[in-house]
């Protein structure tokens, strides 16, 4: 896989209450990824960026909600999430990533 493509696959870590609970319980980290990212690409990107070993990747697509803004109807964007399970002894510290 192209290293340039792998650098663009992961958009941002997801730091929510649910994602933190999953991280503590299942040793998984949640990321927002591009819409056309595949599981092997996500695995390779996490291993390249964070220098950790990935055990598995679970992906979900979330459809954007329709929201009203006064009399105008708008829509939030669709989102693709990846839950990355790390091998035993591996950990990602977002404070040290450059």
Swiss-Prot record:
The keyword Ribosomal protein applies. It holds the Pfam family Ribosomal_L23. GO terms for cellular component: ribonucleoprotein complex; ribosome. The keyword Ribosomal protein applies. HAMAP family: Ribosomal_uL23_B (MF_01369_B). Part of the 50S ribosomal subunit. Contacts protein L29, and trigger factor when it is bound to the ribosome. One of the early assembly proteins it binds 23S rRNA. One of the proteins that surrounds the polypeptide exit tunnel on the outside of the ribosome. Forms the main docking site for trigger factor binding to the ribosome. This is Large ribosomal subunit protein uL23. The gene is rplW.
């Amino acid at each position: 896989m192209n290293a340039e493509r792998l650098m663009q696959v992961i958009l941002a870590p997801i730091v929510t209450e649910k994602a933190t609970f999953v991280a503590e319980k299942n040793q998984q980290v949640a990321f927002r990824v591009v819409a056309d990212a595949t599981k092997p690409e996500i695995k390779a990107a996490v291993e390249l960026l964070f220098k950790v070993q990935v055990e598995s990747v679970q992906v979900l697509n979330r459809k954007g909600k329709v929201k009203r803004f006064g009399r105008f109807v708008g829509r939030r964007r669709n989102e693709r999430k990846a839950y990355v399970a790390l091998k035993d002894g591996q950990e990602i510290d977002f404070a040290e990533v450059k």
